[in-house]
Design a protein with these regions (language model features):
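Interdomain motor-coupling "hinge/lid" segment immediately C-terminal to the ATP-binding subdomain
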Residues: 129-253
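Accessory nucleic acid-recognition modules appended to NTPase machines
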Residues: 202-370, 375
Length: 435
């Protein structure tokens, strides 16, 4: 079993006084169901799990009056082998997007407050909009993502103490011994090639076979394409799939990583395809980095909604869009050109997305200054440049010189830790997991 950080978040929810129902959100196949089942196994006497895709007729439980006593009674008749007891039974409603009345019922479970209820499902951002009465104010949220690099290291047998020692070099800004740095870069390249989808990571942990990982990645991508075909409106199906499958080309095959509609279709325009991007966003299939015209706080004041970069929600899905040879080049460190810079930028944004940062990038056509990633942390703007090699970060240096309110910026590269007189902190690519 792969260790996941989400377990600690669910424990915090359980220990909350007067807790609400917990909605576990996130893209498909990120481990939501598995984590909830394992948590119930370790923390409850009984798990009552209803998967509305598998048990289609279970919607009848929610077809009458949505009082808790009525719903519990219906559950007891449907599942007589289960003991449904307050505080001792976890009620888990999976694939809840298939039963709108179950979504409505969350309000009444929360008001009653006798039973612990967790719900999950994919595409919730879309289907909640169709709920007859969404329980605003009666649910807590936990968003799950694919496995991050630290969780990957746990899966590879690297202990938390070892990671703590590694972070010590980050805190003191001292050079990491070459033997450790070299091995960490090897792990990081493996992680980029595998991505963070739990099934792909588990397959690698078990087999160390990238061909087997590749099969998993391609199967996952087909599942996402199926979801588009199944859940998107008739108007959006084809357009959304075209946009989604263009992402690798948008970010790895050209120098300018801006999402361009002409890469979706010859002559493509925002008027035709922007609604499809919005659909993919609500479906947890993509996330965006928006252009900012200035690097001052608050970044959202300077963001342009029409100028953005689009990313898959996990590296595993990006890998499935490309030939197997890309994984070979990543692991063997033989990438060159746009692909090298693009894949490392992708990995850095993937890590920050999983840390729940809002992502931006900066580009000034007049001065030719460009910053790959801009975020806000602790009320400050942080500039991040990503380098395939250990080259200079001229735009970063120039912007920090002209914006005295920006106290530091990062350059992530193949190299080791270093701090320049200009305030630029150079870090190995893998250190993005620990800032």
């Amino acid at each position: 079993m792969l260790k996941r950080k989400a377990i600690a978040s669910i424990k915090n929810w359980v220990n909350t006084k007067n807790k609400k129902c917990l909605v576990v959100q996130g893209a498909r196949q990120t481990g939501k169901t598995y984590i909830i089942e394992r948590f119930a196994e370790d923390n409850y006497e009984e798990l009552l799990e209803i998967n509305f895709k598998q048990m289609v007729s279970a919607v009848d439980i929610f077809s009458g009056d949505l009082t808790v006593d009525n719903m519990v009674m219906a559950m007891r008749f449907r599942f007589p082998e289960k003991k449904i007891l307050p505080g001792k039974t976890l009620i888990f409603l999976d694939e809840i997007q298939e039963c709108q009345e179950a979504i409505t019922s969350l309000k009444f479970w929360a008001i009653d407050n006798r039973y612990d209820v967790i719900v999950s499902g994919s595409l919730l951002g879309i289907d909640y909009k169709r709920a007859s009465s969404y329980p605003v104010g009666y649910v807590d949220y936990l968003r799950m993502y694919g496995i991050d690099f630290e969780e990957f290291l746990w899966g590879m047998g690297i202990s938390e103490d070892m990671i703590g020692n590694l972070c010590g070099y980050l805190e003191s800004k001292t050079v990491i011994p070459e033997a450790i740095h070299s091995q960490m870069m090897n792990y990081y390249r493996q992680y980029i090639a595998i991505g963070g989808m739990p099934e792909a990571v588990q397959k690698y942990v078990d087999t160390k076979d990238f061909r087997e990982v590749d099969k998993i990645q391609r199967s996952l991508l087909l599942g996402y394409q199926y979801d588009i075909a199944h859940y998107a409106t008739a108007e959006e199906k084809v357009k959304a799939e075209k946009c989604y499958l263009s992402l690798a080309k948008q970010l790895l095959d050209k120098e300018n990583h801006k999402f361009q509609y002409k890469e979706v279709e010859h002559g493509g325009r925002a008027q035709k395809y922007f609604s499809s991007i919005e659909w993919l966003l609500r479906a947890d299939m993509v996330h965006l980095s928006k252009l900012v015209t200035d690097v001052r706080f608050d970044l959202d004041d300077y963001a342009r909604d029409d100028f953005f970069r689009a990313y898959t929600t996990d590296l595993s899905l990006l890998m499935a869009m490309k030939d197997f040879s890309l994984k070979q080049h990543i692991v063997e460190n033989t990438l060159e050109g746009n692909s090298k810079g693009g894949i490392y930028e992708y990995a850095i944004t993937d890590a920050l997305y999983k840390k729940e940062y809002q992502l931006y990038f900066y580009k000034n056509e007049t001065t030719k200054r460009e910053i790959d990633v801009v975020i806000q942390k602790d009320g400050m703007v942080v500039l991040i440049e990503v380098k395939g090699g250990n080259t200079r970060a001229n735009s970063l240096k120039s912007l920090m010189k002209n914006h005295k309110d920006i106290s530091y910026g990062y350059k992530f590269a193949d190299g080791n830790i270093g701090v320049g007189e200009d305030g630029i902190i150079t870090l190995p690519l893998y250190m993005i997991a620990f800032i």
